Amino acid sequence: MESAMDARSQRPRSRQRWWLHALLLVLTLLTTTIVGSRLDANFAANRPAFLIDDDFGFFLAIWDQPRLLIAGLPFSLTLLSILLAHELGHFWACQFHRIDASLPYFLPAPTLIGTFGAFIKIRAPIFSRRELFDVGVAGPIAGFIFLVPALGIGLANSKVLPGIAEQGDLVFGSPLLLWAATKLIFPGVAAADLYLHPIARAAWVGLLATALNLLPIGQLDGGHILYAFFGRQHRRLSQIFAIVLAAIGVIFGWLGWILWAGFFLWTGLRHPPIIDESPVGTGRMRVAAVALVILALSFTPVPVRGSVYL
């Protein structure tokens, strides 16, 4: 194994396509800023955050008055910072282990949050469970470190407006961290009466992305962590967790988890084999416990009522 790792470290690194990374980042900044501008306008006017029928008219207003985009930057910069921290966590873990990897690719999209997220491309094999664990866990932890203060700042700038959370076309669930932080900052205020500031909404999206990535399934970050601990039992355990995810969707009535579980099962749950099957060690077990806590704090059985996607 040492000779294989030496060969990997001596192989020339792939060239980064800086222009493509920069272009995708700028486009994603634009799409998320447009979304943020709408969120800010609705927040200022005490209108529900998402009114689907109002989208086209607002986009025309931005076309006529581009300065409206400035108000969307708090949302977009917060969201992109969380996503960037997550992907750089993976990237730096790869760098530490001399694994060739790309810089983050951002994905602009005409969705309710303006993006499909971001990813890095790992261009070299991962040889050991320790490496796999480090690469898998670094992203969610790095993103969570940025997410927590963003959530605090966003909640501090949120406001109480009776019944606002139940109005509009979409109703958002409360992950455990958001619920606890709300009780701390707004004691006695019902969740339905709290109007989240756009920064808090960006943190909410970060929580959902973190929860999804940490699911112990397939080749998600949580799936990498699962393989690092259980090796060749990974596929069977992934199948079990995918079925559990579908069951959560059935029990709580959210089609999204059922669709995600079906997607995971349909695309296959195999994981590339690892050469070095040595245990990850006690220290990494503690880090895995931290990742499990982050998953518990980020997950919500019904992320969005009224939609199965963002």
What role is predicted for each listed range?
Residues 1-310:
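Hydrophobic transmembrane alpha-helices and their immediate loop junctions
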